C-alpha cells in the first residue's frame, strides 16, 4: 500500500464551519455534529430501517443517502457522517460476520494464528462500490454541508476478529499481541490495508473529511498503544494525507493516549467526556484541533443541565485554543444514545451555535 492514491477534484466549501475549524481557520460559528447522529434516536430512522438488517442497509446506496441526510435536515448539524458500520469493509471483503441485534458484530471464524491472518481476504475497491455510490448521491444533495467518511482503526477491527465479537476485557486480543507479536503485526498490517482501501474509496467518491474510529483503544496502556497500535494507525493517516482533507482520530477512554494519538497524523483529535478539553490540548500538544466532548448521558438531564455543561465545555475549548489547539468542533464524547430525545439534540445544536 505504499503508492499514494490520486483523487479527483472535490466540492469546494470555503465557508463550512467544520472544515474551517479542522483546518485551523476561524469558523463563522462553532461547528457541531454528533457521532451516531443518524441512528435509533430518530423516529424516521427507525421507520425506514424497519425489517432491514444493519449490514443490508449499509450496502443500499439510496438508503444510506436518506439515513445520512435525516439528522442534517432535522438538527441543522454542521456535517453529515456517512451511515455505515466499522465492520462493513470486513464483510465486503468476504469475512463471515454478521451484526447481531443486542450483541454487535459476531465473527464466525476468529483469527488466532498466522495461518488465520494469511487466509483473510483482502478488500478491493469494487467490493465497496455501493458505499462510493452513496457518497456520490450525498455530495449531490448536501449543498454546503460537509460529508465525513469513516472507517474503523486497525486495532478495533483486530479486536473484533480475534475475540469473535465485542469484548469487555479484550483478553484474547492482548494475549495475541504480547505472546505472538509477529502474528499481531501481520494482522494489523492486513487490517490497515483494508482501512486504507475503504477510506480511499470514500475519498475518491468525494467525502470532505474522514474520521478513524478506534473504539476499543481505551483498553490499552500507553506502552501497548505505542508498540502494537500506533505504527499501523500512523500508516493509515499517511496513506490518505494526499487527499488534503481533514483527518479526525477518535477513541473512547483514551485520555492517557491522547499524546500518542495526536502523533498518528490526524488534524483533529476527538476527546471523550472524561477529560477537560484544555487538559486534552496540553496532552495532544499544539497544532491540532480538538473535537468533543459532552457526555451523551447529560442529554437526559434536561435543558438547564445541558446548557450548564455546554457552557463549561465551550469555556474549556476556548482555553484549549489559547493553549495552542487550532480549532474546536463540538460533539459528544461518544455516540448518541438510542433513547435520546431528538428535540434535545436539535436544541443542543441551536445552543452551540448561539454561543
From Swiss-Prot:
Enzyme Commission number, as recorded: 4.1.1.37
InterPro entries according to UniProt: UROD/MetE-like_sf, Uroporphyrinogen_deCO2ase_HemE, Uroporphyrinogen_deCOase
Example of a GO cellular component annotation carried by this entry: cytosol
MF terms in GO: uroporphyrinogen decarboxylase activity
Keywords: Cytoplasm, Decarboxylase, Lyase, Porphyrin biosynthesis
Residues that bind substrate: 36-40, 85, 160, 215, 334
Pathway assigned in UniProt: Porphyrin-containing compound metabolism; protoporphyrin-IX biosynthesis; coproporphyrinogen-III from 5-aminolevulinate: step 4/4
UniProt-listed SUPFAM superfamilies: UROD/MetE-like (SSF51726)
Subcellular location per the Swiss-Prot or TrEMBL entry: Cytoplasm
Broad enzyme group: lyase
GO BP terms in the entry: protoporphyrinogen IX biosynthetic process
Coarse class of the protein's main subcellular location: cytoplasm
Site entry (Transition state stabilizer), positions: 85
Catalytic activity: uroporphyrinogen III + 4 H(+) = coproporphyrinogen III + 4 CO2
PANTHER family, per database record: METHYLTETRAHYDROFOLATE:HOMOCYSTEINE METHYLTRANSFERASE RELATED, UROPORPHYRINOGEN DECARBOXYLASE
Role: Catalyzes the decarboxylation of four acetate groups of uroporphyrinogen-III to yield coproporphyrinogen-III.
Description of how the protein assembles with itself and partners: Homodimer.
Family: Belongs to the uroporphyrinogen decarboxylase family.
Name of the protein described by the UniProt record: Uroporphyrinogen decarboxylase
Originating organism: Rhodococcus jostii (strain RHA1)
Phylogenetic lineage: Bacteria, Bacillati, Actinomycetota, Actinomycetes, Mycobacteriales
Gene assigned in the entry: hemE
